[in-house]
Amino acid sequence: MVGSGGTGAPPPRSSPMTTLYVTQPGSVVRSEGGSLTVWVETEADDPGPNDSPVRRKRLASVEPHRLESLVLLGFTTITANAMRLCMANKIAVSLLDGGGGLAARVVPPEARSADLRLHQYALHLDPPERLIRARAVVTAKLRNAAAVLRGIRSNQASSAALASAITQTEASAEAAAAAVSAESLLGIEGNGAHQYFAGLRTAFVGGIPFLGRAQRPPPDPANSLLSFGYVLLGNRLTGLLEARGVDPCLGFFHDLRPGRPSLALDLLEELRHPVVDRLALRICNLRKIQPQHFEPDAERPGGVKLTVDGRKIFLEEWEGHLARPLREPGVAAEHRLDVHRLLQRQVDRLVSDLRGGEPYRPFRFGTSRPG
């Protein structure tokens, strides 16, 4: 199955730049007539003596200027010519394994900015400046987590566990704002995340339970959804950073690790709960995703992944979710940004900070007052 903008068909000309997801096993992305086409080969039913035993079916054809990224999931491939077409049109290509984990990214030559990266390196090597930004990231993450839990409380019967989780997560946010070292900040973040997920656990009331956050690999359907969503959102942030010439691997809160986009993960922290967790909760509680949409992950023993049909459902919901505005304190409804534009704004804020402008301001989710 192919999803473009989550619809299974190319977006209309008036739509913004989008992502093409290729999920049907055996699909091949080709370059034909200046367009990216997706084909799948299947065995023909009762072929005649002169017929080919293989049937080819075209699933989609998209003009490259309408795309910003291409995501291949599981057993799907891309030809060398199609890859060249993507690079020529500045389309980032991401390869995800069957469980939704990121295997590789292929990106066009970067628009590197030497002065911008020098500023980034200088901040990274300045522990006090790095701590200031790491504190802002973690504080925003925990405040947004508490706001998500308050939203849950307003939409369903509260419980002692949920009320306690809100209080403890808010307390962790205040502690993060006052952290005096990177080590203490890491401990505060871990404790706050534990309290938050204990509260989120009470909100899954559909056919898919959530027993607590677990990963590497995700052992159950709810964790599989969260992990998949985090990969998709982090991948999008990585692409935006690369497009601005920022080094996505040099973060402030997340340490350096080979191949890890630490800066993208920093930006992800303030967004993962308002964006990914709320979507996973909604589609589970509305039973749009059900237990039959998951299967054991053969690539990661003990893990669980979405089936092909499950991925289709999730990606359709995902793209729709990214087009919805998010609440911000003090921002009127008509001025709220959808997730696409919000991500770009946050990257713009970061770039301004790196160039010596206003210190980075993380996204704040929710209303001005708790409750």
Swiss-Prot record:
GO terms for molecular function: DNA binding; endonuclease activity; metal ion binding. CDD domains: Cas1_I-II-III. Homodimer, forms a heterotetramer with a Cas2 homodimer. Its EC number is 3.1.-.-. Keywords: Antiviral defense, DNA-binding, Endonuclease, Hydrolase, Magnesium, Manganese, Metal-binding, Nuclease. This is CRISPR-associated endonuclease Cas1 3. InterPro entries: Cas1 (IPR050646), CRISPR-assoc_Cas1 (IPR002729), CRISPR-assoc_Cas1_C (IPR042206), CRISPR-assoc_Cas1_N (IPR042211). Belongs to the CRISPR-associated endonuclease Cas1 family. The gene is cas1-3. It comes from Rhodospirillum rubrum (strain ATCC 11170 / ATH 1.1.1 / DSM 467 / LMG 4362 / NCIMB 8255 / S1).
